[in-house]
Every structure is written in structure tokens, then in C-alpha cells.
Amino acid sequence: MRTRFLIVDDSELVRKSLRTVLQANPEWEICGEAPDGETGVELFKELHPNIVILDFQMPGINGIEAARRMSEIAPAVPIVLFTQHASSDLEKHAKEAGIRSVVSKTNAFPMVGMIEALLGPTDSEPAAAEPGNSEKGPS
């Protein structure tokens, strides 16, 4: 099963860039995009994504409030705040709202690795062999 992403950012350029990066992984798909927090919350209810990438500063409700509403609906869904305004104070408020990680738009390179860590191992990844359970061929 593919991992479904919801992207919420008021910048079309940022949404397009994220779409390009995320769609490079054949196991990931973009199930929806929203230009503001309110629309993002509505799409979250409707589309049931596996993970959300969300901007902080947007028209209407900001990313913290959108994340709070999403977390009330489905607390297990990881939310990543992707922002130009990263600070320790913002990270504190983000965690309180249910956001799992804050990534700065000025240094987005770790984004894919961080998403993979949030999602955990997938069915397509081989499981690590348990000690003492190695298969033996015919003797």
C-alpha cells in the first residue's frame, strides 16, 4: 500500500517542489494539496492521509492551529511543519499541537530521511534476520 501525503502550503512553488521530491519515491503518493490551513483540515477529514506536510504561516488559520485540529481527528497521523520561521519557541508550540517534526525550508535536505523515520519500516523493506533463525540449505 502506498503512503498518502497531504501537502498544505500557500505557496504553489513550495507545493510543486514537495510534490516533485515526494513522488520520486514510488511508494509515496500525493492524495491532496491545500493552499491554506482551513482547506487542509477539510481535506484531512475527507482524504485520510498517512502523513501531512504543512506550512506555518498561511492565510486564515496557521499551521499550528491546523495541526491541532488534525491531531484531534486522527492523533496517530504524523504531521511535519515545513516552515521558514523555525525557532525553539515555534517547535515547542508545534509539539503541543501534535506536530512530530519541524523542518526549516532553508535546509530541506533532511526531509526525506526524516519522513522515512516517521513512517518506520515499510512492507517492501526486508526485515532484519533474527539471531538463531537463519535458514539452512539441505545438508
Describe the residue ranges of each PLM region.
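Conserved phosphotransfer cores of two-component systems
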Residues: 45-47, 69-76, 97
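Acidic catalytic/metal-coordinating carboxylates
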Residues: 36-39, 62-65
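Active-site beta3 strand of CheY-like receiver
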Residues: 47-53
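Conserved acidic segment of CheY-like receiver
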Residues: 2-14, 18-22
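Receiver (REC) domain active-site loop signature in two-component systems and cognate sites
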Residues: 58
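Alpha4 helix (beta4-alpha4-beta5 surface) of REC/receiver domains from two-component response regulators
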Residues: 65, 85-113
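Conserved sequence signature across two-component system core domains
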Residues: 8-9, 34, 52
